[in-house]
Amino acid sequence: MAKKYDFLFKLLLIGDSGVGKTCLIIRFAEDNFNSTYISTIGIDFKVKTIEVEGKKVKLQVWDTAGQERFKTITTAYYRGAMGIILVYDITDEKSYENIQNWMKSIKENASAGVSRMLLGNKCDIEAKRKVSKETGEKLAKEHGIRFFETSAKSSINVEESFTSLARDILLKSNKKPGPSGREVKLTSTEKKSSSKCLLL
């Protein structure tokens, strides 16, 4: 059977527990929102194919648990990621301050040159804002990465942010030597639906 995509990119969302990583992924992959999601246990992923620069790009978006007790499991997934999205909650200053620790975690565990992006989530809750947009922009600029304020609930900048990161990875991969760029082939045995890893 013919392949239905040109590239497969693995993206990883990291950030403190409760910042809305799962909600962002479900909004992006399924265009759905539910405020009663329980915390992710270990790691989970969703798949969505989008069009970028005339190419069909299949995104495998991995959702990680933000709690410290799952750190050993989640950091194991950094290595194969081509894009890492750092998420904080604009109504929770601590989640923003912890972005520096997540950046350190990327440096220690991810592949060199991985594409990164910073998202300030829950921008629909303006009345409870604790982190200004300028503060987020400043941090992203310091690290030389893209920044978006998003809302999974109101569907603000969700599609745009994922697409822009996919475009960055695609353009970067096109500059690499070799005929295949960063194309990754899936075997027919690989599951195409959502998969969960639970710790009992």
Swiss-Prot record:
Primary localisation category: membrane
Region annotation Disordered: where it falls in the sequence: 173-195
Activity regulation info: Regulated by guanine nucleotide exchange factors (GEFs) which promote the exchange of bound GDP for free GTP. Regulated by GTPase activating proteins (GAPs) which increase the GTP hydrolysis activity. Inhibited by GDP dissociation inhibitors (GDIs).
GO cellular component: bicellular tight junction; cytoplasmic vesicle; endocytic vesicle; endosome; insulin-responsive compartment; lamellipodium; lateral plasma membrane; neuron projection
Domain notes: Switch 1, switch 2 and the interswitch regions are characteristic of Rab GTPases and mediate the interactions with Rab downstream effectors. The switch regions undergo conformational changes upon nucleotide binding which drive interaction with specific sets of effector proteins, with most effectors only binding to GTP-bound Rab.
Alphabetical GO biological process terms: angiogenesis; bicellular tight junction assembly; blood vessel morphogenesis; cellular response to insulin stimulus; cortical actin cytoskeleton organization; endocytic recycling; endothelial cell chemotaxis; exocytosis
Membrane topology of the entry: Lipid-anchor
Location of this chain's protein in the cell: Cell membrane; Cytoplasmic vesicle membrane; Cell junction, Tight junction; Golgi apparatus, trans-Golgi network membrane
EC number(s) from the headed UniProt entry: 3.6.5.2
PROSITE patterns noted in UniProt: RAB
Protein name per its UniProtKB record: Ras-related protein Rab-13
Calcium keyword on record: no
Propeptide position ranges: 198-200
Gene behind this protein: rab13
Keywords assigned by UniProt, alphabetized: Cell junction, Cell membrane, Cell projection, Cytoplasmic vesicle, Endosome, Golgi apparatus, GTP-binding, Hydrolase, Lipoprotein, Magnesium, Membrane, Metal-binding, Methylation, Nucleotide-binding, Phosphoprotein, Prenylation, Protein transport, Tight junction, Transport
Pfam families, per database record: Ras
Binding site for Mg(2+): T22, T40, D63
TM regions (residue ranges): none
UniProt catalytic activity: GTP + H2O = GDP + phosphate + H(+)
InterPro entries per the UniProt record, alphabetical: P-loop_NTPase, Small_GTP-bd, Small_GTPase, Small_GTPase_Rab
Task performed by this protein: The small GTPases Rab are key regulators of intracellular membrane trafficking, from the formation of transport vesicles to their fusion with membranes. Rabs cycle between an inactive GDP-bound form and an active GTP-bound form that is able to recruit to membranes different sets of downstream effectors directly responsible for vesicle formation, movement, tethering and fusion. RAB13 may be involved in endocytic recycling and may regulate the transport to the plasma membrane of transmembrane proteins. May regulate the assembly and the activity of tight junctions.
Any one GO molecular-function label of the UniProt entry: GTP binding
Listed Basic and acidic residues bias regions: 182-193
